[in-house]
Amino acid sequence: MRRETIAIHGGFDGDPTTGAAAAPIYQTAAFLFDSADHGAALFNLEVEGFRYSRIANPTTNVLEERVAALEGGLGALTVASGQAATYYAICNLADGGGEIVCTPQLYGTTHTLDRKSVV
């Protein structure tokens, strides 16, 4: 598949129920559970599925699959803000108990994150 095609259609093969060719935007915060036990299993990560949009939803899943395909990666992660992206990057690159060296001229909240939260 050409890069341009991946950018437009990657991560979504069309909806067999509606025939939609483009991925829909799911404007919901919560998802239905089959039962209380099913909801508990979702939140305990015992089964796959959607539980709350801030964690994951079908719209962001398509975006993540599309970005991974464009970049030739195994996966991708979308987050709600640049600060969240900074946090994830620091947590995944820095070793526990180590040091993070940064300039005090960073965005103030990033500096606070580095000095107070990620220690």
Predicted regions and their residues:
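Conserved N-terminal alpha-helix of the aminotransferase class I/II PLP-enzyme fold
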Residues: 35-84, 109-115
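N-terminal glycine-rich, Lys/His-bearing helix-loop that initiates the first secondary-structure elements
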Residues: 1-47
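Conserved PLP-anchoring active-site segment centered on the Schiff-base-forming lysine
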Residues: 92-110
